[in-house]
Amino acid sequence: MKAVDVLISGRVQKVGYRAFTRKNALLLGIKGYVENMPDGKVHAVLEGDDHQIDKLLELLRQGPVVSQVRDIKVTEIERAGHQGFEVR
């Protein structure tokens, strides 16, 4: 099990990116949250199995059809024991 802090930049707000993240996180059994940032980026904290996290990160690099992901920064962090997956 691991936890990562993820910062996604590009055209990622007002394109369904948070809903896309939540849907795929729930399908993969990942806990945490996703939120819009004031600077136009999307921030997520993901907790789960290494393989599941890697799979979700692959999906986040693609994003929903109308998004344009420019960059993803991933930092490993300590797990906080999130319950479920929340859109903030």
UniProtKB/Swiss-Prot annotation:
GO MF terms held by the record: acylphosphatase activity
Stated family: Belongs to the acylphosphatase family.
EC code: 3.6.1.7
Enzyme class: hydrolase
Keyword vocabulary terms for this entry: Hydrolase
PROSITE patterns, per database record: ACYLPHOSPHATASE_3
InterPro entries per record: Acylphosphatase (IPR020456), Acylphosphatase-like_dom (IPR001792), Acylphosphatase-like_dom_sf (IPR036046)
One Pfam family cited in the UniProt record for this chain: Acylphosphatase
Protein name in UniProt: Acylphosphatase
The Acylphosphatase-like domain, residue ranges: 3-88
Catalysed reactions listed for this entry: an acyl phosphate + H2O = a carboxylate + phosphate + H(+)
Active site: 18, 36
